[in-house]
Amino acid sequence: MASSVMSSAAVATRGNGAQASMVAPFTGLKSTASFPVSRKQNLDITSIASNGGRVRCMQVWPPINMKKYETLSYLPDLSDEQLLKEVEYLLKNGWVPCLEFETEHGFVYRENNKSPGYYDGRYWTMWKLPMFGCTDATQVLAEVEEAKKAYPQAWIRIIGFDNVRQVQCISFIAYKPEGY
């Protein structure tokens, strides 16, 4: 009998200890009506955080006869010196240069399906093999010149591939055909 009294007392003590450490449930934020208002309310529409007033000065890029291809394509065409600097940056970061070309469409297009897929213009034909071990930017530009001679009506882009993470890190147009 003493053992049963002892165990029930232990259970009761534990139950009280657990109830003492309970936290009250969240009941919401308190009203700020009790606090004095220290600033006047500005009902002017220009004080509301919005970019609605700025929309009038934004412009849309005209897509007719002015297609854009990659991130740097909104800038003027890169000169040979600028291309050399971009390729040097690519090599300095340890990325593998790779050339790709496209003979028909230099931009994303959807011909076979409305959803993105393999044949929507994102995947171009690779020029030779990736230039593993390349440390000279002029070698990459020499390959660009060779690709231009072989396909003068093609778009040519240079890609920097990180072979450790297996991702494409940089991509830019190195050559566009006449009229684009």
Swiss-Prot record:
It is found in: Plastid, Chloroplast. Pfam families: RbcS (PF12338), RuBisCO_small (PF00101). The keyword Transit peptide applies. Residues 1-56 form a transit peptide. Its main location: plastid. GO terms for cellular component: chloroplast. Keywords: Calvin cycle, Carbon dioxide fixation, Chloroplast, Photorespiration, Photosynthesis, Plastid, Transit peptide. One of its GO terms (molecular function) is ribulose-bisphosphate carboxylase activity. One of its GO terms (biological process) is photorespiration. The keyword Plastid applies. Heterohexadecamer of 8 large and 8 small subunits. PANTHER family: RIBULOSE BISPHOSPHATE CARBOXYLASE SMALL CHAIN 1, CHLOROPLASTIC, RIBULOSE BISPHOSPHATE CARBOXYLASE SMALL SUBUNIT 1A, CHLOROPLASTIC-RELATED. HAMAP family: RuBisCO_S_bact. The basic functional RuBisCO is composed of a large chain homodimer in a 'head-to-tail' conformation. In form I RuBisCO this homodimer is arranged in a barrel-like tetramer with the small subunits forming a tetrameric 'cap' on each end of the 'barrel'. Belongs to the RuBisCO small chain family. RuBisCO catalyzes two reactions: the carboxylation of D-ribulose 1,5-bisphosphate, the primary event in carbon dioxide fixation, as well as the oxidative fragmentation of the pentose substrate. Both reactions occur simultaneously and in competition at the same active site. Although the small subunit is not catalytic it is essential for maximal activity. This is Ribulose bisphosphate carboxylase small subunit, chloroplastic 5. The gene is RBCS5.
